[in-house]
Amino acid sequence: MSVKIPRSVYADMFGPTTGDRVRLADTDLIIEVEKDFTIYGEEVKFGGGKVIRDGMGQSQVTNAQGAADTVITNALIVDHWGIVKADVALKDGYIAAIGKAGNPDIQPGVTIIIGPGTDIIAGEGKILTAGGFDSHIHFICPQQIEHALMSGVTSMLGGGTGPSHGTFATTCTPGPWHLGRMIQSFDAFPVNLGLAGKGNASQPAALKEMIEAGACALKLHEDWGTTPAAIDNCLTVADDYDVQVMIHSDTLNESGFVEDTIKAFKGRTIHAFHTEGAGGGHAPDIIKVAGLPNVLPSSTNPTRPFTKNTIDEHLDMLMVCHHLDPSIAEDLAFAESRIRKETIAAEDILHDLGALSMMSSDSQAMGRLGEVIIRTWQTADKMKKQRGSLPQDSARNDNFRVKRYIAKYTINPAIAHGVARLIGSIEQGKLADLVLWSPAFFGVKPDLIIKGGSIVAAPMGDPNASIPTPQPVHYQPMFAAYGRSLFASSVVFTSQAAVAEGLAKKLGIQKSLYGVENTRSGISKKSMIHNDATPNIEVDPETYEVRADGELLTCAPAEVLPMAQRYFMY
């Protein structure tokens, strides 16, 4: 016997279903459920008097016979490929299925089997996303990693050796010895980690040495001299080893202008960091490269989004990060040349057009690594408020805009850096790196962070309390962050050459190495999901005004942002 219930009652019980709409945090962004994989009247839910009990929603199937290790029930998945309601099965640390969970002995349409060996995470009324991937990390201190994890970031790629002056300014780990020590330290951290070697060299030998020693990418940084010769050499070596190259080009235009840098690319694929230019790069027109078919452009979050405070905070930030002296006129001029309100405003719009493909932090080196996700959605909200709905969206929802923006910190950096087969989206066969959110706290404070199928971090109340929720509630590492579980649930990104050389055994590390792949000619701007636009971008050298296909890109700075102070009162 079936009974009809109001949508509101159903949503309270099982979460939203097809056609229901959900607001993301306190933004103006509204998503609508496109499809519900569960079956009305056959939903599974855990708890006293609920469905997932022996002989009801729980079968007798063993894990060896195919029952899931964990099922996240009735979750609202938000990913680049869709916004859908489903049960999600995790098995052996990977995403095993997305569909309808239950007991196939008594329930129809079951594609995920719940057995006695299955644990349940209640996803009713929650949003499930892939773990974030921050591909612009200055590894200045190890404490960064926990802060990033608690924000919903489960993978980090960058460079450094700790609080050295080279690391303060540049995202690269120079030389085999430093690479080895850093990779050995990665056994302590429950996230996926990768290192970029220093790419600034005009001859290949030193770069090859670093790739074989475990670098999964090479970084060209102007503070080490990003000359056309270094660019060409670095890309040539990267092509030979199938690793990505990231570039921070020549702000001072000493060794050439943006046209010379583009010429040195020779059409080869490259990841352009902080493409707007406030983080560094040819002044004032590095932003032009965002329109090239071979450039994978990203932003760092200090300029995201453009607000009334953005310009003021940047100058001091830049002086500290790049070891500049405010008493030296040339240093001050260098800093001031990088901070331009016109290009920062254009950056907002280029993100909304899908011309800027990725978001990252620039951790402690002008960026805040715990705010990659927050600032992505603040940018999306600002653009909706200022530009209205995208042409691809209906009046009812912002689904396409949401898919465009979530791709910027999940699947697109994974594609750019050759790890999309492992991470970056909620798809069958990928590592179960997942984040569960309450809609009201979406993008700001996660409910649960899952790493390699295990709960790695969560907000937790007083451990001495009689229930888990009494204050004070703090984000804490969970069991997957300790012991050998840590090694089993995360990997180190390296080159395939390092894997073939047996680097893990040489360094005596416990984590598995994952060799990056398909980072060169196999990908281009067209590979950037929902963010593959290649407009012709022009910058006026006198006024710094930016035009895309002839249209002036300008917008007002935000006076107030969502996902901000009201979430951090305590």
UniProtKB/Swiss-Prot annotation:
Cofactor note: Binds 2 nickel ions per subunit.
One GO BP annotation of this record: urea catabolic process
Pathway of action: Nitrogen metabolism; urea degradation; CO(2) and NH(3) from urea (urease route): step 1/1
Binding residues for substrate: 221
Coiled coil spans: none
List of residues binding Ni(2+) 1: 136, 138, 219, 362
PTM (free text): Carboxylation allows a single lysine to coordinate two nickel ions.
GO molecular function per UniProt: nickel cation binding; urease activity
Cofactor(s) in the UniProt record: Ni cation
Annotated positions of the N6-carboxylysine modification: 219
The protein's enzyme class: hydrolase
Hydrolase keyword on record: yes
S-S bridge residues: none
Catalytic activity annotation: urea + 2 H2O + H(+) = hydrogencarbonate + 2 NH4(+)
Family: Belongs to the metallo-dependent hydrolases superfamily. Urease alpha subunit family.
UniProt-recorded name of the protein: Urease subunit alpha
Source organism (scientific name): Rhodopseudomonas palustris (strain BisB18)
Gene name in the database record: ureC
